[in-house]
Amino acid sequence: MSLKNSYVTSDYMEWDSMLSLVRKLYRDKEYRLSLLIGCGSFFGLRISDILSLTWSMLLDDEKFVIIEKKTGKRREIKVNTNFQKHIADCYTALGVVDKNERCFISRKKTVYSTQRINMLFKAIKSKYNLKIEHFSTHSMRKTFGRKVVEAAGENSEFALIKLSELFNHADVMTTRRYLGLRTEELLETYDMLSF
């Protein structure tokens, strides 16, 4: 919980750190958490939409469609072919019987709450000694965005336009701020000065 009048935001993870965490969680038999962090980072969805995913959505086709809870807009997601194997491995390891079952349910068979996931993330951060200051459910979406921008290289402006549309942001500047790029750009101004 944040202090009143304080500004706390989630941070993104470096892509390789995220992949390493997903693998470690899987190795430690934390299949649902491994899949949750993978889905969040590969799909760029809000946690409310991730929690609505079913196994059939992830396994039956290379694409699936959701109606975003926050915006009510239709969004088509393509499942990365490299990530599909991890999804299938988690499905098998969990021994899921019903493909229509939600992917992210607790041992009590109830869908996790965002608050519960954030508590689990806090424990994960500590247990796996993650080098991320503010690790929350939003970190996955930011990890996705950062990776897309970094992978675009010289075409990063075009990537920001695409992300702005994917994230349903009003404009590219909102996406820049959201990913923390604007703050970095402003801080670089101080490095332009010489002494």
Regions found by a protein language model. Name each.
Residues 36, 44, 48-53, 163:
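Alpha-helix N-cap/helix-start motif at helix boundaries, enriched for small hydrophobics
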Residues 2, 13-43, 154-155:
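Basic, Lys/Arg- and aromatic-enriched nucleic-acid-binding interface segment
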Residues 1-19, 72-81, 100:
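DNA breakage-rejoining catalytic core of tyrosine-based enzymes
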Residues 18-19, 82-132:
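Active-site/catalytic core of tyrosine-dependent DNA strand-transfer enzymes
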Residues 68-71, 167-192:
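Catalytic-site neighborhood detector that most strongly recognizes the C-terminal catalytic loop/helix
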